């Protein structure tokens, strides 16, 4: 007990392995390492989303929807990292932190370019999470269950939502009123639906219900109407 008391509040010397916590039991070191690597990736993703928020929040951009979405996306990624770190600590593990690199791209030509980077980033997160799940599946049933129930559905939902947005932007284009209308719709969606990390999928009914009627043509096609503006 005295030995343990002396270790409270003290970090292990550089290059030395941390002392195992009393709660640690059958927590595979390979799974622990994979968890920590994914935590770093989530924090980098949060940093990336935060840089997008800063870009679109400038007065020369004033993209309300994008700023709200990017701020929320940054928050969600940071919260996922926190939940995973808390899980590692609950299992008696140790989170070894390292530097987070600055985002390679800090400016975007248009919304389509920005969402392309968002989708690519989210796919990297999903690939890492799937690799982590496969690592844990054969080594630690509790870890794999945590990933499947607490993480996987959330990331897949985010990927689907961002991909749907990108597909709509392909149709709308980057000229005219289209991007402005999309940004205003995005602002409403973020405020009305993104109240928890489980992001709902984007549907045509959602899109149409948040756009003024005058932006639809006679046949009810919003994309075609926007191109005429």
Curated annotation (Swiss-Prot):
Which residues belong to any copy of the Ferritin-like diiron domain?
25-173
A GO BP entry: iron ion transport
List of residues that carry N-acetylalanine: 1
Work out whether the entry's keyword set contains Signal: no
Name the UniProt key words of this record, in alphabetical order: Acetylation, Iron, Iron storage, Metal-binding, RNA-binding
For this protein, the parts annotated as crossing the membrane are: none
Q: Which SUPFAM superfamilies match?
A: Ferritin-like
What's the miscellaneous note?
A: Artemin is elongation factor-associated and self-associating.
Tell me the protein's name: Artemin
Q: Which organism is it from?
A: Artemia salina
């Amino acid at each position: 007990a005295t030995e343990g008391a002396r270790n409270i509040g003290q970090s292990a010397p550089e290059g030395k392995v941390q002392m195992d916590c009393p709660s640690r039991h059958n927590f595979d070191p390979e799974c622990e390492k994979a968890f920590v690597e994914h935590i770093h990736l989530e924090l980098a993703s949060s940093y990336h989303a935060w840089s997008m928020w800063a870009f679109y929040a400038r007065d020369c951009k004033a993209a309300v929807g994008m700023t709200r979405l990017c701020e929320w996306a940054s928050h969600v990624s940071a919260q996922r990292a926190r939940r995973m770190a808390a899980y590692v600590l609950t299992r008696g593990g140790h989170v070894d932190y390292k530097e987070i690199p600055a985002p390679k791209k800090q400016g975007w030509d248009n919304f389509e370019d920005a969402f392309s980077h968002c989708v690519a980033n989210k796919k990297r997160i999903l690939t890492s999470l799937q690799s982590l799940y496969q690592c844990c599946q054969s080594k630690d049933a509790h870890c794999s269950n945590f990933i499947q129930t607490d993480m996987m559905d959330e990331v897949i939902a985010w990927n689907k939502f961002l991909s749907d947005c990108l597909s709509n932007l392909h149709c709308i284009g980057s000229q005219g009123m289209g991007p402005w209308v999309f940004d205003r719709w995005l602002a409403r969606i973020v405020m009305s639906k993104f109240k928890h990390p489980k992001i709902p999928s984007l549907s045509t009914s959602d899109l149409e219900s948040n756009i003024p009627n005058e932006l639809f043509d006679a046949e009810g096609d919003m994309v075609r109407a926007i191109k005429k503006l």
